[in-house]
């Protein structure tokens, strides 16, 4: 464990993670300054921390303050390229991310899950397996509860953490027992200079792992396969397209687990989660517990009892023969592709939001094949309209509520309305969850035609 008493620590970013970091360092006797671009009045939930000696640097990041710190603890939403942070790095000030700081304090083995899509579902699936197995597991990270909160207890048997590329940018010694790379498609290109930089951030997950550790990788994702050919740890693959000699495979009806001379088969008809992408999530989630000795019947019962997460392809309502789905978590093109691919019948797609700089071309085939009406909202609407012009009927809406009204007008019985934005939410909402809640309320308020 690191020693922080008396050290001047600047926590950059006053979101949920930043507040957790501030509390962590205050509890250890550090002199803590919370630095944020917002004004002091705009910060919430800081009164208690202020009473315990937290100091503030508001309205921007003071370059001299950061350059004079003993340590900078950076929130994942703050790029290392922010001038004051970059200047401190150049001055030799150590800059560490939340997962690096937390991992140094935690003794329990960790499963760290990254990838472009499926991270949250896989993380929660594994947490459910651990719970049913009787193991005390912290489940969080980029999903929900920040990893730093796990340090408030020493009783964990396992740490199950969703990890983002942003979090991996500021690691040094971070080393999970199991590192999981679910898939790689274009995302966050508003933060990264290109796809190569994004992939490089994801691959940092494995850089401190050793032959004692295990990488769980998607054998069907060509970019994952190319990127993980030379890892310092063991590899266990999973595939939803074939049965593997070693690893987790799929024959179209059964998940087949082959490892160390053993074979187990699981019927996917038992699962509440639907769609091939969820078969992949289940396969990935099963691997670490089964390798650690969890009985197969307990693991399978756990995943079969899991019905999914909010705002991830959730059926909100059926009205006048139309099914309405909330997939507000679909914040990148790859996620929308998987959601559309799992739907039958004509689709009205509500998409748009804050553009992340990616390429919309991978959606073109499904837009032309399945989408009868595309209703666009938000900042990205112009780019998306240009990308899909001539492929389907395109409508524009000034708000999500207006988009729901338009969707009801144009979608006939037997059709599906899908909110799967392919963009982040921050141009119109505080989070994808708020966007999903607004959508659900608007759908529930619709009046049927009799």
From Swiss-Prot:
Pathway of action: Cell wall biogenesis; peptidoglycan biosynthesis
Gene Ontology biological-process annotations: cell division; cell wall organization; peptidoglycan biosynthetic process; regulation of cell shape
EC number: 6.3.2.9
Matches recorded under Pfam families: Mur_ligase_C, Mur_ligase_M, MurD-like_N
Domain of life according to the entry: Bacteria
Catalytic activity of the protein: UDP-N-acetyl-alpha-D-muramoyl-L-alanine + D-glutamate + ATP = UDP-N-acetyl-alpha-D-muramoyl-L-alanyl-D-glutamate + ADP + phosphate + H(+)
SUPFAM superfamilies with a match to the protein in the record: MurCD N-terminal domain, MurD-like peptide ligases, catalytic domain, MurD-like peptide ligases, peptide-binding domain
Residues engaged in binding ATP: 115-121
InterPro entries membership: Mur-like_cat_sf, Mur_ligase_C, Mur_ligase_C_dom_sf, Mur_ligase_cen, MurD
Cellular-component GO terms for this entry: cytoplasm
Compartments where found: Cytoplasm
One term of GO molecular function: ATP binding
UniProt keyword terms in alphabetical order: ATP-binding, Cell cycle, Cell division, Cell shape, Cell wall biogenesis/degradation, Cytoplasm, Ligase, Nucleotide-binding, Peptidoglycan synthesis
PANTHER family, per the entry: UDP-N-ACETYLMURAMOYLALANINE--D-GLUTAMATE LIGASE
Free-text function comment from the UniProt entry: Cell wall formation. Catalyzes the addition of glutamate to the nucleotide precursor UDP-N-acetylmuramoyl-L-alanine (UMA).
Similarity field: Belongs to the MurCDEF family.
NCBIfam families listed in its UniProt record: murD (TIGR01087)
Protein name listed in UniProt: UDP-N-acetylmuramoylalanine--D-glutamate ligase
Gene: murD
């Amino acid at each position: 464990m690191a020693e922080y008493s008396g050290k001047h620590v600047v926590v950059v970013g006053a979101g949920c993670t930043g507040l957790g970091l501030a509390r962590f360092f205050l509890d250890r006797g550090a002199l803590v300054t919370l630095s944020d671009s917002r004004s002091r009045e705009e910060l919430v939930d800081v009164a208690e921390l202020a009473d315990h000696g937290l100091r503030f640097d508001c309205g921007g990041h003071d370059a001299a303050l950061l350059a004079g710190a003993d340590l900078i603890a950076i929130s994942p939403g703050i790029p290392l390229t922010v001038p004051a942070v970059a200047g401190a790095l150049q001055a030799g000030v150590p800059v560490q991310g939340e997962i690096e700081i937390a991992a140094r304090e935690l003794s329990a083995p960790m499963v760290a899950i990254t990838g472009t899509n499926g991270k949250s579902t896989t993380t929660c699936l594994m947490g459910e397996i651990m719970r049913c197995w009787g193991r005390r597991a912290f489940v969080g990270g980029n999903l929900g509860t920040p990893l730093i909160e796990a340090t408030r207890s020493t009783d964990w048997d396992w740490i199950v953490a969703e990890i983002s590329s942003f979090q991996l940018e500021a690691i040094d010694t971070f080393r999970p027992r199991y590192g999981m790379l679910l898939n790689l498609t274009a995302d966050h290109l508003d933060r990264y200079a290109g796809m190569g930089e994004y992939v490089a951030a994801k691959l940092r997950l494995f850089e401190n792992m050793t032959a004692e550790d295990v990488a769980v990788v998607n054998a069907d994702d060509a970019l994952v396969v190319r990127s993980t050919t030379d890892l310092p740890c063991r590899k266990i693959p999973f595939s939803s397209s074939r049965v593997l000699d070693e690893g987790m495979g799929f024959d179209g009806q059964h998940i087949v687990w082959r490892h160390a001379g053993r074979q187990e088969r699981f019927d996917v008809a038992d699962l509440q989660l639907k769609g091939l992408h969820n078969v992949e999530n289940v396969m990935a989630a099963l691997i670490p517990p089964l390798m650690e000795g969890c009985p197969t019947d307990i693991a399978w019962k756990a995943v079969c009892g899991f019905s999914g997460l909010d705002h991830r392809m959730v059926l909100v309502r059926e009205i006048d023969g139309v099914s309405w789905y909330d997939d507000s978590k679909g914040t990148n093109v790859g996620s929308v592709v998987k959601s559309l691919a799992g739907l039958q019948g004509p689709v009205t797609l509500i998409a748009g939001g804050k553009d992340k700089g990616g390429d919309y071309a991978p959606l073109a085939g499904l837009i032309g094949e399945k989408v009868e009406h595309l209703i666009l909202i938000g900042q990205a609407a112009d780019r998306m309209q240009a990308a899909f012009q001539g492929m389907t009927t395109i409508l524009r809406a000034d708000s999500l509520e207006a988009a729901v009204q338009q969707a009801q007008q144009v979608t006939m019985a037997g059709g599906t309305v899908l909110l799967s934005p392919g963009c982040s939410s921050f141009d119109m909402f505080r989070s994808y969850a708020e966007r999903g809640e607004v959508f659900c309320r608007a759908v529930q308020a619709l009046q049927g035609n009799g």
